[in-house]
Amino acid sequence: MEEAEKYLLKGIELCERLNEKGWNTIAHSYLAVTYFEMGNFPKSKDYYEKVCGLLEHTRLMPSSLGLAKIGAARSRVMNNEKHVDLESLYAHSRNNKIKTIEGENSKYIGEILLNIDDQHISEAEHWIQKAIEADQRNRMMFYLGKDYALYAELFKRKGDRLKARENLGKAIEIFKECGADGWVEKYEKELAIIL
């Protein structure tokens, strides 16, 4: 992840020098995701908010703006900032017009619901299932692997170790098919702990 961070920061620097808006926005988006995966939720939130600013300024890609707003909320929740306007997040998901991010929207909302408190577990499960269905339908295999990994986390929280192992196993198989060796290694370690 550190290598990704380095190259994305360099890409952002070059885009800003060239005043290149499109690739700059994409680089900011991937940097927000990278920081999230690194567990640096404040930086992830900051970069998602920068993406929102860039997209609001250009008034292009409202569906991507919705995903960035959901991503920022997810980073806030993981940073223990629990006040989130769930209805606005649901509206962003409903208003999405890009099939390839349909599952990501649902997964992010599922992750928010799973981590905001203990009262939204069944809603989180519904949104994670929606993410799985969307990513299967749209053939977004890497994201499908992430969906199953999150589903495994939900079952761990519910105390269902068998279903947690089953879903983590599905995630690992998908990551193997994608050639995502780092993710295979990460989740194989998690699977060994669930034993």
Q: What residues fall within each predicted segment?
A:
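Helix-coil-helix junctions within alpha-helical repeat/solenoid scaffolds
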Residues: 1-195
